[in-house]
Curated annotation (Swiss-Prot):
Subcellular location: Cytoplasm
Gene giving rise to this polypeptide: groEL
PANTHER family reported for this sequence: 60 KDA HEAT SHOCK PROTEIN, MITOCHONDRIAL (PTHR45633)
One GO BP: protein refolding
Protein family per UniProt: Belongs to the chaperonin (HSP60) family.
Function: Together with its co-chaperonin GroES, plays an essential role in assisting protein folding. The GroEL-GroES system forms a nano-cage that allows encapsulation of the non-native substrate proteins and provides a physical environment optimized to promote and accelerate protein folding.
Name this polypeptide is given: Chaperonin GroEL
């Protein structure tokens, strides 16, 4: 077992703080409309330029293992916030740093860490409730565009593009982001369907960067039973291989020998194939497989209908323009089914919706309807260089995620002002002792930090002056860092999704509390590399310079 290095008490917390500060200081320069870019060196290719907090956080790995632990804990704040809400990663990092910094001061002064944590937890609960109280729902295209613009680092073109996409396929419709062949960024709506089943094996992946399996112009086998015997599957595999087109297999499951054989042939390059489980369960699964068959112009191979897998021919297979499969979802784009058949199926489902007496059944039927009729909106992102395209694509994906969050939970005033307005929720927080009261005050101070940092990044205005003026105001009044004017921020389009602000605070408080209550830190002892003496030239002694 490797030897361990252990630090205790204030020594451990001090080292962790150095790591927290190093990461947070690199991330927080990107906050707000006046935030700066961070340049990240890559082992291969050109450096990456980004203004996305989580991208910066993910690149940071420190040489000191204790400092690195602190940095990785805060990186978790940014990653979790990005996963849940799509934006707010820099805000979350700034909040985590502020809570930890203020908490450490009080721990050093003799406060009990566990009571500080309880106070912080109670304070966060009340602030989150206050954020919900001041949140407002969004519906209009203009409001959706505003959220998209802010989340895409104040790029109105991206905001408008996302609003158009949501307008065309609905707020719950499927929207994907792809790299364009040229320089133009455009929206394209294509008929398609997405269901929540990913690939059965990561060996099916064709794009290792995105971990997707991408099949162009594939054939689609739709089978309603498990496939465990390779003999059943072999005839149709041979026929699809002869056609030269990739194959998507949708079945209840593929087990053992059959899956292993498919994977081996995929790795050898004999087959271009991907396998996924069928969506849904029971009767709903049968209906969804039928939907896929109608959309792609295929036939569900079902023994109930008298079809057997070993007798299947190419004519039974569905077809599509493209299929993308990740670990969680399968998206079928440009199904080659007949327009009349698809329309008839849509009308049939609409009839079932009208007759349905169960809310759950109605919801599931409407989901199927959206998948058949809503289509997929594809945002093709163009740019002059690959570096710019990757950065822009990442911003669009973040903005799309954040816009969906805004549709779910509504919006609050942006620019760090919502957290200032939510401070009044702390008046409801009840403390059992002085240390818990201190925990509540730590949150009161930390909630001011995002606004201070937004102002600091402008480089022209005193943060303390702005903070006092914003505190003196009410409602949507705040400081617009883009124009450096005091105004109604909602009317100026400066808004944040409530979910983003809430997630940032909850995740920051969670990780900062763990760090505050840490009493020991353990890492592996670094092994010293021994310097081997170089062999003298001319071979070994007595060997006459043999080489």
């Amino acid at each position: 077992m490797t030897a361990k290095d252990i630090l205790f008490d204030s020594d451990a917390r001090a080292k962790l703080k150095v790591g927290v500060d190093k990461l947070a200081n690199a991330v927080k320069v990107t906050l707000g409309p006046a935030g700066r870019n961070v340049l990240i060196d890559k082992k291969f290719g050109a450096p990456t330029s980004t203004k996305d907090g989580v991208t910066v956080a993910k690149e940071i790995e420190l040489s000191d293992p204790f400092e690195n632990m602190g940095a990785q804990m805060v990186r978790e704040v940014a990653s979790k916030t990005s996963d849940v809400a799509g934006d707010g990663t820099t805000t979350a990092t700034v909040l985590a740093q502020a809570i930890y910094r203020e908490g450490l001061k009080n721990v050093a002064a003799g406060a009990r860490p566990i009571d500080l944590k309880r106070g912080i937890d109670r304070a966060v609960k009340e602030v989150v409730q206050e954020l919900r109280n001041i949140s407002r729902s969004i519906s209009g295209k203009k409001e959706i565009a505003q959220v998209g613009t802010i989340s895409a680092n104040n790029d109105p073109v991206i905001g408008d593009l996302i609003a158009d996409a949501m307008d065309k396929v609905g707020k719950d419709g499927v929207i994907t982001v792809e790299e364009a062949k040229g320089m133009d960024t455009e929206l394209k709506v294509v008929e398609g369907m997405q269901f929540d089943r990913g690939y059965l094996s990561p060996y099916f992946v064709t794009n290792s960067e995105t971990m997707d399996a991408e099949l162009e112009d594939p054939l689609i086998l739709i089978y309603d039973k498990k496939i465990s015997n390779m003999k059943e599957l072999l005839p149709i595999l041979e026929k699809s291989a002869q056609s030269g087109r990739p194959l998507l297999i949708i079945s209840e499951d593929i087990e053992g020998e059959a899956l292993a054989t498919i994977v081996v042939n995929k790795l050898r390059g004999t087959l271009r194939v991907c396998a996924v489980k069928a969506p849904g369960f029971g009767d709903r699964r049968k209906a969804m497989l039928e939907d896929i068959a109608i959309l792609t112009g295929g036939t569900v191979i079902s023994e109930e209908k008298g079809y057997k897998l070993e007798n299947a021919t190419i004519s039974y297979l569905g077809q599509a323009g493209r299929v993308t499969v990740d670990k969680d979802n399968t998206t079928i784009v440009e199904g080659k089914g007949g327009a009349e058949e698809i329309k008839a199926r849509i009308n049939e489902i609409k009839g079932q919706v009208e007759k349905s007496t169960s809310d759950y059944d109605t919801e599931k039927l409407q989901e199927r309807l959206a998948k058949l009729s809503g289509g997929v909106a594809v945002l093709n992102i163009g740019a002059s260089t690959e570096v710019e395209m990757k950065e822009k694509k990442a911003r669009v994906e973040d903005a799309l995620h954040a816009t969906r969050a805004a549709v779910q939970e509504g919006i609050v005033v942006g620019g760090g002002v919502a957290l200032i307005r939510a401070i009044k929720g702390l008046d409801r927080a009840i403390a059992d002792n002085e240390d818990q009261k201190t925990g509540i005050e730590i949150i009161r101070r930390a909630l001011e930090e995002p606004l201070r940092q937004i102002v600091a990044n402008t480089g022209t205005t005193d943060g303390a002056v702005v903070l006092e003026r914003v505190k003196a105001g009410t409602g949507d009044f705040g400081f617009n860092a883009r124009t450096e004017q005091y105004e109604n921020l909602v009317e100026a389009g400066v808004v944040d999704p409530t979910k983003v602000t809430r997630s940032a605070l909850e995740n920051a408080a969670s990780v900062a509390s763990i760090l505050l209550t840490t009493e020991a830190a353990i890492t592996d002892v670094k092994e010293e590399k021994s310097d081997m003496p170089a062999m003298p030239p001319g071979g070994m002694g007595g060997m006459g310079g043999m080489y």
